[in-house]
A protein has these predicted regions:
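Short, well-ordered secondary-structure micro-motifs
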Residues: 111-112, 163-165, 208-209
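Aromatic-lined glycan-binding groove of carbohydrate-active enzymes
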Residues: 99, 103-107, 138-192
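Short, surface-exposed connector motifs at secondary-structure boundaries
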Residues: 30-35, 60, 122, 147, ...
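Active-site gating/metal-coordination segments in enzymes
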Residues: 1-133, 140
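Aromatic-anchored helix/helix-loop segment that forms the rim or "lid"
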Residues: 125-133, 176-207
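Hydrophobic faces of well-ordered beta-strands that scaffold small-molecule active sites
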Residues: 34-37, 62-64, 99-101, 151-153, ...
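Mid-to-C-terminal alpha-helical segments outside catalytic/metal-binding sites
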Residues: 20-28, 49-53, 57, 140-141, ...
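Short secondary-structure boundary/capping segments
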Residues: 117, 167-170, 234-236
Length: 280
C-alpha cells in the first residue's frame, strides 16, 4: 500500500515509481486498458505535480487515498473538505481526469484483533471508510466550486450508497441550522451527477439500484486477480447478481458506465474485440 505511511513525501515517491511502472507496462495498450495514476494527497504541492505529470503521460484516471494522511485521524487533521485542498481540486478539474477512492486506503485496515477480527477489519476498517471522501465531496461545497470533478468508490460495493445518499440529505435538511455552506442542490444530487461506485457481487445493492434509479452510477468489476473477486467465474457471478436486469441496464453496468467514466472509445474497444476474436 503506497499510502501506508504518515510521510506524504515518501508516499508520493512510491506512487511515482508505481506510476512509471504502470505506464511502461500498460501505456502501449491505452485504447483498451486504463491504469490509474496513484497520488499521495498529504502534500498538496507534490500531489499537483504528480497529477500534471501523469496527465501528460496519458493516464485516464487517478487513484487517491480515502484520507489525505495515513492514520486514525482527528478533527485537527487535514481532510478533503478543508479549503486548502481547493488547489488540488482545481488541478484535477483542469486535467479532466476522474478520481477514484479504493478500499483499505487512508487508514490501517487491520484495526481489530481477536475474535471476529478478519470480518470486523474487512467491513469496518476496509469497506466503511470509503464513504468518507464521497461525503466530503458531496456535502462541503467542493462540487459547486469545481463542477467538472468526477469520482468513484472502488471495490466497496453499492448496497450502502442509497443509504448514504439518504443520510446526507437528511442531515442537510433536518440539521439545517448547523449546516454550512448552503449548497446549490441536495448532497445526493451531486453523487448522481458526478459519482460512481464499483461492485463485484452485491444483490441487495442491485435491488436498491433499481428502486432508486442509480443504473447510471454503478459499474461492475471482477477484481481480478484477488480471491474475493469473481474471476474465473465472472459469467456465473453476473447471472447470479444481474440475471433479472434488462439488457439496457446490464449494458450500462457491465461496460457503458465505465467507458463513459474513464473516457474510452467504445467503437475502438469493439473493433479490438472483433479483431481478437477473428485471430482466435
Amino acid at each position: 500500500n503506497m499510502w501506508a505511511t504518515p510521510d506524504p513525501i515518501f508516499s508520493q515517491a512510491m506512487c511515482r515509481v508505481y506510476n512509471d511502472y504502470a505506464w511502461e507496462v500498460f501505456g502501449p495498450y491505452y485504447d483498451r486498458l486504463s491504469p490509474l495514476a496513484c497520488v499521495a494527497t498529504g502534500d498538496i504541492d507534490s500531489a499537483i505535480a504528480e497529477i500534471e505529470r501523469c496527465a501528460k503521460l496519458g493516464f485516464r484516471g487517478l487513484s487517491l487515498p480515502c484520507k489525505p494522511m495515513w492514520g486514525p485521524g482527528t478533527s485537527e487533521d487535514a481532510n478533503y473538505n478543508n479549503p486548502d485542498f481547493d488547489r488540488l481540486w482545481a488541478c484535477i478539474q483542469d486535467v479532466n481526469l476522474p478520481m477514484t477512492f479504493h478500499v483499505s486506503t487512508g487508514k490501517d485496515p487491520r484495526g481489530a484483533k481477536g475474535n471476529g477480527g478478519a470480518v470486523i477489519n474487512y467491513v469496518i476498517h476496509s469497506l466503511a471508510p470509503t464513504a468518507e471522501p464521497l461525503v466530503h465531496l458531496c456535502s462541503s461545497g467542493i462540487l459547486d466550486r469545481f463542477p467538472g470533478l468526477r469520482f468513484a468508490s472502488i471495490e466497496a460495493g453499492i448496497g450502502w450508497i442509497p443509504w448514504m445518499l439518504r443520510a446526507m440529505d437528511e442531515a442537510y435538511e433536518h440539521h439545517h441550522f448547523w449546516v454550512f455552506p448552503k449548497l446549490n442542490m441536495l448532497p445526493s444530487e451531486y453523487f448522481r451527477l458526478h459519482g460512481a461506485a464499483s461492485f463485484q457481487e452485491d444483490p441487495p445493492g442491485v435491488d436498491l439500484m433499481e428502486k432508486y434509479g442509480l443504473e447510471g452510477n454503478f459499474m461492475w468489476a471482477n477484481d481480478y486477480p484477488h480471491h474475493e473477486g469473481s474471476w474465473p467465474h465472472s459469467e456465473q457471478a453476473i447471472e447470479r447478481t444481474m440475471g433479472g436486469l434488462s439488457d439496457p441496464q446490464r449494458e450500462k453496468i457491465l461496460g457503458a458506465n465505465a467507458a463513459r467514466f474513464f473516457g474510452f472509445d467504445v467503437d475502438k474497444l469493439l473493433a479490438y474485440r472483433s479483431a481478437a476474436t477473428a485471430q482466435a
